[in-house]
Amino acid sequence: MTDCSRCAGTNASGPNHWSERIRDIVDFPKPGIVFKDITPLLSDGPDFASALDEMAQPWRTTPLDAVLGIEALGFILGAALARELRTGFVPVRKPGKLPGRTLIREYALEYGTDRIEMHEGALPRGARVLIVDDVLATGGTLRAALGLAAQLELEIVGAAVLVELLALQGRQKWADDVPLLATLSF
């Protein structure tokens, strides 16, 4: 079982300068939205490595079969975490990007709606997975990934995000019985 004492969504142990590396982009992708850009943090090798280590730490003793990484920046974080945790990686993509048979889930965003998909046979039933994304905003994307994993009869052991936007209350849409860790909160 995962020790979720650090899953409350606060920056309890990360360096303060991590949050300084995440910049606000006003009116992106639409007017009225303030986008949290994590790419400056990703571009710094030592900070990226230490942030990944912080994200991975609670899951190190949790048996996992794969990390599900949500497009697009969840791919980067998810694949790196899968390597760190010595497990597989499965992409959760936007529609039309995966060949073969897929399952699709629609969800609401802070600024509209979107859809994500996974391969039908990506993992065997009962596989233990960790869902990873870059930012938890309204919770729609994570909730959709949770729904896809449930449709595939996967065991969701938890979710990890680099950034949680507390004002948007996305955590309230998450499953109460599934741990959710946010490394940084704004």
Swiss-Prot record:
The EC number(s) this enzyme carries = 2.4.2.7
Record's keyword annotation contains Zinc: no
Give one Pfam family: Pribosyltran
Coiled-coil annotated residue ranges, if any: none
Catalyzed reactions per annotation: AMP + diphosphate = 5-phospho-alpha-D-ribose 1-diphosphate + adenine
Decide whether keyword Cell inner membrane is in the record: no
- Which GO BP terms, alphabetically? adenine salvage; AMP salvage; purine ribonucleoside salvage
GO MF annotations, alphabetized: adenine binding; adenine phosphoribosyltransferase activity; AMP binding
Superkingdom classification of source:
Bacteria
Main localisation: cytoplasm
This entry carries the following GO cellular component terms, namely: cytoplasm
Task: From the UniProt record, give the pathway where this protein acts.
Answer: Purine metabolism; AMP biosynthesis via salvage pathway; AMP from adenine: step 1/1
| EC category | transferase
Q: What does this protein do?
A: Catalyzes a salvage reaction resulting in the formation of AMP, that is energically less costly than de novo synthesis.
UniProt similarity note: Belongs to the purine/pyrimidine phosphoribosyltransferase family.
Matching entries from HAMAP family are given as: Aden_phosphoribosyltr (MF_00004)
What name does UniProt use for this protein? Adenine phosphoribosyltransferase
Q: Which organism is it from?
A: Xanthomonas oryzae pv. oryzae (strain KACC10331 / KXO85)
Gene expressing this chain: apt
